């Protein structure tokens, strides 16, 4: 076997292309959204999130891609032996894609983020209504980072002004830094064991 450091963004792109998938024997996506939230929280804090194990097996017939969309590769070149739930979570959130749950139904994972406090929460009505939250961080990942950040800051300024309050320069810097940190999770490096 060999070990390779790969960035989350590289792995997510391999999944999107269909180059990286699951062997047929793997279970469907079973993590509750709270575990996905905790995964993103650990990453933004710089905590390790484990390793991945991939198997290069071009001859394996019974393997499947992740997600519910069509892919460039008809069958994956590599399959995930260990780390399926983490990679599926990252792919679904960073690409805004639905996954199949244990009942084989399409499922959207909604994770909210508060850039002022740098905290994540499972998306629910409060985070949807409260404009200090990015309701679904998938929207940030599939948008242009600069324009997304500026739109968020402008909306937050308007919210504050409607309450007779001001968004300070210090708060703007905190928001900008934390949204940048959110985007930079795509550069988070994982150790990948290839067998």
Regions found by a protein language model. Name each.
Residues 1-195:
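Basic- and aromatic-enriched surface patches that contact anionic nucleotides/nucleic acids
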């Amino acid at each position: 076997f060999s070990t390779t450091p790969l960035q989350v963004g590289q792995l997510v792109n391999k999944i999107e292309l269909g180059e990286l998938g699951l062997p047929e024997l793997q279970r469907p996506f079973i993590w509750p959204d709270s575990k996905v939230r905790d995964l993103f929280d650990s990453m933004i804090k710089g905590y390790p999130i484990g390793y991945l194990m991939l198997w290069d097996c071009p001859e394996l017939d019974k393997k499947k891609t992740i997600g519910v969309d069509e892919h460039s590769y008809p069958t994956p070149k590599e399959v995930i032996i260990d780390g399926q739930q983490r990679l599926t979570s990252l792919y679904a959130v960073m690409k805004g894609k639905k996954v199949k749950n244990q009942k084989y139904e399409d499922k959207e994972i909604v994770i909210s983020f508060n850039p002022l406090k740098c905290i994540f929460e499972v998306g629910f009505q409060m985070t949807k209504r409260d404009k200090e939250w990015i309701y679904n961080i998938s929207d940030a990942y599939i948008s242009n980072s600069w324009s997304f950040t500026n739109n968020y800051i402008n909306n937050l300024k308007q919210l504050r002004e409607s309450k007779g309050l001001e968004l300070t320069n210090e708060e703007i810097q905190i928001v900008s830094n934390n949204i940048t940190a959110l985007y930079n999770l795509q550069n988070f490096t994982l150790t990948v064991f290839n067998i």
